[in-house]
Amino acid sequence: MANRNIPVHLRHVPMPGVSRFAILAAMDAAVRATLVSVWPLVMYRALGDAAVVSRVYFLVGIAALLTGLMVPWAGRFIPRRWMYTGGVSLYLIGPGLAMTGEAAMVPFAYMLTCAGTVTIFICLNAYVMDYIARADLSRGESLKIFYSALSWTIGPMLGVTLMHLWEPLPFILAACFALALGAVFWTMRLGNGKQIARARAPAPNPLAYLRRFARQPRLIAGWLFAVIRSCGWWVYVVYLPIFCIEAGLGEQTGGIALSLSNALMLLSPVMFRWLQRRTVRRAVQTGFVGAGLLFLAATLGQGWPPLAVGALWAASFFLVFLDMCGGLPFLMAVKPSERAEMAAVYSSFRDVSGIVTPGIAWAVLLVAPLAGVFAACGAGLLGAAALAGRLHPRLGARR
């Protein structure tokens, strides 16, 4: 009888759709995009040595990787909604420490922010796999990219501009976005997701689900697609600006190219319509082949630098396309009872690519000019295209 006086929208929680999750992803992107170009500058000001900054990035990458692998273990004791809220809290604590102006606090602040990113990414992917049907995953990825496009186009330039006005300003703005992210998450009332249990409880240590991951070739292939795609973005974001400076094109050229590449996210609805008429295998192959060939073409730019810039910018179109469809093979292969654990494994692609890319680039630069890094990246992308050819030919096709 008491329920009679409770509003319907409070008694019956609406099932979240792809658009609601896309909004969450877009608000998370607003936090990260505001600070993505600020952290390197603040880190360099605090540490005063590029080599020390590189070492900090390397160590933070390892810490973030370990954090991601421990999230499912912690999730056995902490409800998922509180794990997500904890990630949002790290988005507040990290920038808060950076605003103190203490040089020793900056690396720690960056590490906490990265831990927040990893935690939120894992929880969000677990929720998506709980509530979104396999047939709607591609639409969900398209909407996430489209909703995040404005943040990634404006955020990097806005963050640096605000920092020049007053150094704490971009951190304050990012904290405001984080508060809004937490508020939207709680209004969605996702709870702890759908609880699907096995007959026997899984092993409590993180190595157990790594072994399960290693026994599933489809998951390994899907994870490799994410790692190699992320390596392509690493080369584009880090080494294109360096190439432009060495080639005499100026410091602004690389930044302009990155902003224009992020604006390509606005084309994700068009990409999605193309994807709807193709299978996942063909879409993933197309993305890797296009990006790989254009990265190889950029190696010719050693003699004519504008060619390299143009080829790499064109390759970023295919990288954006892969952001939309490259994760589908993994998401479609995950067993319902392993969603939380495999979401943690999947999230490690960012940290692994952040460790692998600088290492390979360092080895290449010992024997070749900077354009050799583009060639190595192109070869890796084409290798991923060959691997994509082994996907099921009807994966993602509507039945």
Residue ranges and their predicted role:
Residues 39, 119-132, 321-334:
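Intracellular juxtamembrane helix-capping segments at the cytosolic ends
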Residues 113-148:
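Cytoplasmic helix-loop-helix junction between adjacent transmembrane helices
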Residues 337-366:
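A late C-terminal transmembrane helix in Major Facilitator Superfamily
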Residues 6-61, 218-257:
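Helix-loop boundary and gating motifs at the non-cytosolic
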Residues 170-187, 374-389:
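Symmetry-related core transmembrane helices of the 12-TM Major Facilitator Superfamily/SLC fold
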Residues 2-16, 192-225:
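Juxtamembrane intracellular "pre-TM" segments in multi-pass secondary transporters
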Residues 82-96, 282-297:
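Structural signature of the two symmetry-related core transmembrane helices
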Residues 67-79, 163, 268-280, 365:
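Helix-to-loop junctions at the C-terminal end of transmembrane segments
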